Amino acid sequence: TASEPWLHWHDRLHRQLLLKPTLLPRGTTLLLALSGGQDSMALLGLLRDLRKHHHWTLQLWHGDHGWHPGSACVSKDLAKWCAQEALPLRVSRSTAEMTSGEAAARAWRYSELSQYAQQLNQTCASSNSCTVVTAHTASDRAETLLMQLSRGTDLAGLGSLRQSRPLQANASNGPRLVRPLLDFTREETAAICQDLQLPVWHDPSNSDLRIERNRIRLELLPVLESLHAGCSRRMALLSERISQVHDTQNALVDLSLQSINSPGNGLQRPPLQALAPDPRRTLLQRWLQQRGVRSLQARQLEELSRAIGPQQPPGERHLSSGHRLHWCRNWVQLNNRD
């Protein structure tokens, strides 16, 4: 196996994890999604060398999307290198139909990782659940912020690349997804690979300018960096602060909702009517999300908030989620559509 040096990169991640002990708990099984690119190889090098200090068990997973002719060779070479390093690697291969686009490929990867993590949970002796780890960086966070900003989004979208979250949005009790490298830039992961003498496999699809993220990475961000050096890291920090503001807002909104709950799991309408439009809309959105309504567009939410507001008659709306929102003088209620 490779030697285990202690460089300033190790010290930086080690100290970060000591400050956040629940991020990658001591003694847990870590399942690292390994593409073979510089980010995931850098994270592998750091986790491999730090595992004896945190008593982790390290498992690796690689997904072959088959997007370019050499992808099978990358999988083979990566598996050979991992075997030489005594690192356990599972390789999954998709079909063109399963990963026809970015969103489909991401869904396939997370589904495969979730299934493998659950298998590891059943077989590992650790009392901690298996944690899925990916190598997203501050650079990825800046790109995501720009994409979401240009598409049009809310606070949740601007702070969407979080350091820790459930792997599957609909399975809060399932495996968790953790991104330990969000404080590192892509330039730093390249330096880590060089300093640790790690091989890197390049994916030609990362240079495809038909992909939105690649255009932002290769064309837009270099211009912004030339104008304001270090802007990628500052945008990543802004995304983190936005996610914290969003969490704080949700906590305060939840407290407010508790005070206006009505019998039958509804809401008291008079307190909602007494609010200004913005806080009323925020409370209504959170209440609907908690009850499974997640597909409302901004204009629909605005219309619903206005309809239940002051000086408006009783009424109802049928939502695309299959729910029926109805309100009378004193309460607002949400039911499944008959």
Report each predicted region and the residues it spans.
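Charged, solvent-exposed alpha-helical segments that act as regulatory interaction surfaces
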Residues: Q122, L155, A229, R233, ...
